[in-house]
Amino acid sequence: MSAQPTTPTTAPYGSWASPLSAEALAAGGINFGDLRGANGRLYWVENVPARGGEVSLFSFGDGATAQVTPNGANVRTRVHEYGGAAFIALGDTVYYSQLSDQRLYELKRGGTPRPVTPPNYRYADCIALPRAAKSAAALVCVREDHTDPAHVRNTLVRLPAAMPGGAAGAGEVLFDGSDFVSYPRLSPDGRRLAFITWNHPNMPWDGTQLKVAELTAAGLKAPVLVAGGAAESVLEPQWDADGTLYFISDRSGFWNLYADGAAGARPIWPRAVEFAAPLWQFGQSNYVLLGDGRAVVCFSERGIDRLAVVDLKKGTGRELDLPYVEFSHLTRIDSQHVAAVAGASKSLASIVSIDIASGKATTVRTAGDSPLQSDSISIAVPIDFPSAHGRTAHAFYYAPTNPRYRGVPGTLPPLLALVHGGPTSQASPALRSSVQFWTSRGIAVVDVNYGGSSGYGRAYRQALNGNWGVVDVEDVIAAVRFLVGTERADAMRTAISGGSAGGYTVLVALSTSDVFHAGTDRFGVSDMTALARDTHKFESRYVDSLIGPLPEAQAIYDSRSPLNHLDGFKVPVLVLQGADDPVVPPNQSQRIVDALRARHVPVAYILYPGESHGFRKPETIINSQQAELAFYGRVFGFKPADQLPPLTIEGLPVASLR
């Protein structure tokens, strides 16, 4: 006999008991990256929560998965601080960047890792050069030189892969003619090297250049500009087997695929959708060439990803019917199969192998079982809503969902507005335990793709230029008002939460509007001038486009800094910060906390030792999630069902609790 359905318990929103604990959220926080095919196998990196979030290299072949690097080998590069493309597999040998010292290590099958580059240099995005007669194979890598920390240099270098005595040196410089360089890609005949460059103050989603140069024993000869410029973002160069160079450009207003030719660049299957994402990390791959005149491309439309098979000569495409809403790290297995990291609405991220002919996907590795039963998962609902000055903005709305509970009649749920980082990142509808943590407890969530987000074209992405702290705040406020106006949220119990650039938006919104009644700032910016002065090279001129260049725009920096709007803070603030954050240093959080304390604004502050830009340790993830839940419970007057550690909110009188 089937079980009889139980009658849902009536309980206040926010107080519902959820099977998704903070501990389960931390244990299931596995992320996959740098997926690539090599040597007839798939390789990727994933963080291991049981080892404090340490990142290990794994491979899959012959139906089995194996860990390649030993425990303790933390495979992460800090080039640009955000890293990516931290390893390369060559036959029975892998080379990887070790987080602790940023040196390249050589690991032969069955052997012990040994460093092959000196300290004070960082490496990423390495490719293999073909072995010439009687000579060793070599690597070409992006190198970041930190021998003089005040003048960091980014170059392309050549390293010998067979390193007598274990020492490669720092590498032979091939190209040093730009502030930044990425995507070194070798032509099939081994004679030409394509690569992407850009200079301050541009970010790679603003303007880059695709260059090609002849590669000789003496180095690179006279790089030639193929595409790009200060107002065109070119990414992901790839050579086809016939020697054709393909790349992605946003010259049409959307990142689309192009083929280089004698008559100029030719668009391939042009559409008003995005075929790429901002280059925050090395090694991003949003299309693969199959070697038979076809490519598999990933494109994003209204924030939802799809895959299509494209005929490169005819310019036609066929979408694949797959049960996923997010794809990344596309890689070729063979002419009939590709692999990707895929996310779905009701299952956690997986590495999947896709049969192109049938459209069938086979799971290679999963981040774990779904944290909730299917009927307990809140599905993302895309919403478009009016914002300031006639703009239309976008978001994903998640309704409170727990079959064991229903809200008290006549009440509406609290609403948590999430603000992604970047600020050019993108909210995705794929299942995230961090969202379901709230919805399964009776708290509605809106994940906002404010103006400046990627996934909606260049114009939408540039809507934040000169307007950071304005457009993003307007759009998040508009999302909340839209949901309150459609009776999906309690206007008196609205909160805002974000990290990094999203944390800055949180602070501005709290200091300049009365829409929110609580806010959580995770390592956000409080002083714009200090950010421009103190941050790392990659982002050191980012704010030039978002606000303006210094010193000309000093008055705007001052007006956009939350530290200069302290009188506007009226509601409780929770601040969470990593003590070792090189992107947004801890003094950004400490200064705003000290200022709020001095003005008796209710504030709670937690500084996490050993954490950087984004939390990785399970104990930190657990504590920060529990603290945020306790914070909203105190402010909004509901009692969470969880057993939570005490949280001190300085300046919040008990009498203020509802």
Task: List each model region and its residues.
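Conserved beta-propeller blade repeats
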Residues: 27-38, 74-94, 120-138, 176-194, ...
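Non-catalytic accessory segments flanking enzyme active sites
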Residues: 31-34, 45-46, 54-55, 66-67, ...
